[in-house]
């Protein structure tokens, strides 16, 4: 049963100014921070941050709740983004971007 749908749209270039250590620690889990450190190129770093921000916002909207961003870990597995909460809720995630706009969608399903 679907329990919620969340959508978020961001401008990728806005993350150019948001690369402080404080912002990174508030947005990313430790594992995500380690992945971020391996991303080469400013544009790719902006996209990495925009994807995580937008997916986490969409997830919170789908769940109709708000928590710390670091409570959610986004992983890219076989080309698809995933986030596990618990065995009772499955999250279906999707992103798309064109130019400087990125849209993320999350569907929360009770299983």
UniProtKB/Swiss-Prot annotation:
Top-rank lineage group of the source organism: Bacteria
Enzyme class: transferase
Cofactor annotation: Mg(2+)
Keyword list, A-Z: Cytoplasm, Fatty acid biosynthesis, Fatty acid metabolism, Lipid biosynthesis, Lipid metabolism, Magnesium, Metal-binding, Transferase
One GO-annotated biological process of the protein: fatty acid biosynthetic process
Principal location listed in the UniProt entry: cytoplasm
Localization per record: Cytoplasm
Protein name: Holo-[acyl-carrier-protein] synthase
């Amino acid at each position: 049963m679907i329990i919620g749908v969340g959508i978020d749209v961001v401008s990728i270039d806005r993350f150019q100014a948001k690369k402080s250590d404080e912002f990174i620690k508030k947005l990313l889990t430790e594992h995500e921070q380690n992945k971020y450190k391996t991303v080469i190129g400013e544009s790719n770093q902006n996209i990495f941050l925009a994807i995580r921000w937008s997916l986490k916002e969409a997830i919170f909207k789908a769940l109709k709740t708000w928590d710390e961003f670091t409570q959610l870990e986004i992983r890219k597995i076989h080309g698809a983004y995933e986030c596990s909460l618990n065995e009772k809720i499955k999250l279906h995630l999707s992103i798309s971007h064109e130019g400087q706009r990125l849209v993320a969608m999350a569907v929360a399903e009770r299983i």
